[in-house]
């Protein structure tokens, strides 16, 4: 399972070119590749090219990519519950990023990366 996420802001550009390779003798392989991208503003761009290169017959592999913006409905909901627009945007961005951060298997590293991500999101 491969999960790659990106947030592109202002004039930023994100590029994802991932490949899952399954050799001929790797029968019964299961693999999934996913790339999710969040655009903040009209000047941001993302180019996504997930790829599967499969030479085995008996496999279960798939891939997908999404490009989207912050949910206006979710922002509205959070503002109606007292969050400022800025905090609602930050919360939505952090939730998007945290889906990757929480999968980090190294004990003690998750908190550090959460802090770095939150600091970066605060500057967006």
Where are these regions (language model features)?
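Active-site gating/interface segments in enzymes
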Residues: 1-124
């Amino acid at each position: 399972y491969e999960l790659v996420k990106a947030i592109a802001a202002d004039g930023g550009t994100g590029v994802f070119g991932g490949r899952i390779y399954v050799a001929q003798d790797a029968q019964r392989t299961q693999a999934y590749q996913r790339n999710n991208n969040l655009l903040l503003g009209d000047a941001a761009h993302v180019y996504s090219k997930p790829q599967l290169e499969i030479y085995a017959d008996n496999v279960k592999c798939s891939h997908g990519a999404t490009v989207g913006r912050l949910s206006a409905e979710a922002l509205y909901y959070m503002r109606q519950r007292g969050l400022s627009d800025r905090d609602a945007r930050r919360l939505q961005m952090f939730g998007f990023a945290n889906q990757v951060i929480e999968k980090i298997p190294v004990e003690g590293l998750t908190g550090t990366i959460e802090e770095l991500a939150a600091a970066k999101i605060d500057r967006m």
